[in-house]
Amino acid sequence: MKFLSFNYKDAESYGVKVKRKDAVWDLKKVFAEFGEGDFHPQTLLEGLQQNQTLDFQEQVRKAVVAAEDSGKADEFKIAFNDIEFLPPVTPPNNVIAFGRNYQDHASELNHEVQRLYVFTKAASSLTGDESTIPNHKDITDQLDYEGELGIVIGKSGEKIPKALALDYIYGYTIINDITDRKAQNEQDQAFLSKSLTGGCPMGPYIVTKDELPTPENVNIVTKVNNDIRQDGNTSQMINKIDDLIEEISKYVALHPGDIIATGTPAGVGAGLQPPQFLQPGDEVKVTIDNIGTLTTYIAKD
């Protein structure tokens, strides 16, 4: 399943993509009419949280089948052209990111890979697919992109052993880890340079892990104005997904809806010769196999 959150007619909702169509089942409406018992989650985060006691996907499947068979299915579907994409989920706790997790990317920025490099991004930096984000020209002329595979946590845990790590994943998404390279190079921490308004585009969907069975062998392609800048594969990650979850959870309790960005391959603007940073009016597209394409626009003014 591909889950998303959206605005429609000034109201926030969430849903699941209609198969083979650019449309969404509005799950707030579907559950209100066809949900079993009291299972009426109002947000995707609520659904993920309840997944610890109920099978959220199975509840969605049953409700959507009932809507499909009701004779009024179109009342519960909305075309993508009519919605504004939001971040699929806004984590109440953690947006955690890993840097230097691809050797070629670390090398292009002249960084050594000696140990895990971990930072957080402010939840206020999250934005959805097709968003226009500020160009931040008032503070930097070195705005950069980083296409990444994102992990969405599906159940709570800490000190998670590597052998069980994948059990704690609900699904995967796409993240563009927008970075102010000027601030990053001037400061001893990454939080500020990584937390600009609009600095964490995410989406368009969360794809459940059953639909992405080999997340460590998917292509990541980033284009700026249709020019390919990054063309990598998650098989190039130094620390694999289970390694990352095991290491984080030694120190940080993970909860449903938490996001983990797993690092970016080579080809960022700062690593090109000469550097090519994002400019007002640019279009950035990050595509990952079996998830989709995340599009971000840099404001002209």
From Swiss-Prot:
Keywords: Metal-binding
The protein's name in its UniProt record: Uncharacterized protein SH1982
Positions bound to a divalent metal cation: 146, 148, 177
Family the entry assigns: Belongs to the FAH family.
GO molecular function, one term: acetylpyruvate hydrolase activity
Domain of life: Bacteria
PANTHER family: ACYLPYRUVASE, ACYLPYRUVASE FAHD1, MITOCHONDRIAL
Disulfide bonds: none
